[in-house]
């Protein structure tokens, strides 16, 4: 086998179907478009979702929910991540410096994932009920 002798396997390549090129091709006359109707005409198309004048599905269904504008500015921090921090007083600035939340975050909440075994003081951060219980059980406290 040499690079200049490589070729596709027998039957691997097929010629493209040429539509509208005579009755013998099997795709002559109407070229696979059928008879009459909008889709058989040149330039005949409709918008995505158009249902022939019937109210489209995306307009029949009610609007629901909304996009929160504050979502991207609120961060979540796990208890397990707080365990690894070298500081005992934890506030938003300490979380940003440790890289646990992004620079754009304006408020953060501690969630009860992982374990906390050391005493910490939390300042100006929210916490779930489970996280608050775990921090207080480890001897920690919340300073608002």
Curated annotation (Swiss-Prot):
GO CC, one annotated term: cytosolic large ribosomal subunit
Chain positions covered by the region annotation Disordered: 1-56
Keywords, ordered alphabetically: Ribonucleoprotein, Ribosomal protein, RNA-binding, rRNA-binding
SUPFAM superfamilies attached to this UniProt entry: Ribosomal proteins L15p and L18e (SSF52080)
Molecular function (Gene Ontology), one example: structural constituent of ribosome
Bias-annotated ranges (Gly residues): 21-31
PROSITE patterns named in the record: RIBOSOMAL_L15
InterPro entries according to UniProt: Ribosomal_uL15 (IPR030878), Ribosomal_uL15/eL18 (IPR021131), Ribosomal_uL15/eL18_sf (IPR036227), Ribosomal_uL15_bac-type (IPR005749), Ribosomal_uL15_CS (IPR001196)
Gene Ontology terms describing biological process: translation
Classification via Pfam families: Ribosomal_L27A
NCBIfam families per record: rplO_bact
UniProt record similarity statement: Belongs to the universal ribosomal protein uL15 family.
Functional summary from the UniProt entry: Binds to the 23S rRNA.
Complex formation: Part of the 50S ribosomal subunit.
Protein name, as recorded: Large ribosomal subunit protein uL15
């Amino acid at each position: 086998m040499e690079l200049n002798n490589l070729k596709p396997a027998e039957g691997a390549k097929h010629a493209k179907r040429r539509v509208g090129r005579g009755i013998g091709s099997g795709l002559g006359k109407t070229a696979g478009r059928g008879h009459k109707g909008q889709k058989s005409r040149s330039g005949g198309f409709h918008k995505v979702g158009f249902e022939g004048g019937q109210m489209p599905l995306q307009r029949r269904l009610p609007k629901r929910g909304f996009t929160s504008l504050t979502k991207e500015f609120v961060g979540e921090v796990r208890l397990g991540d707080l365990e690894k921090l070298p500081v005992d007083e934890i506030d938003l600035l300490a979380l940003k410096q440790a890289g646990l939340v992004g620079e754009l975050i304006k408020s953060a909440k501690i969630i009860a994932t992982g374990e906390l075994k050391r005493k910490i003081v939390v300042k100006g951060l929210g916490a779930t009920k489970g996280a608050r219980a775990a921090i207080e059980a480890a001897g920690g406290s919340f300073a608002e």
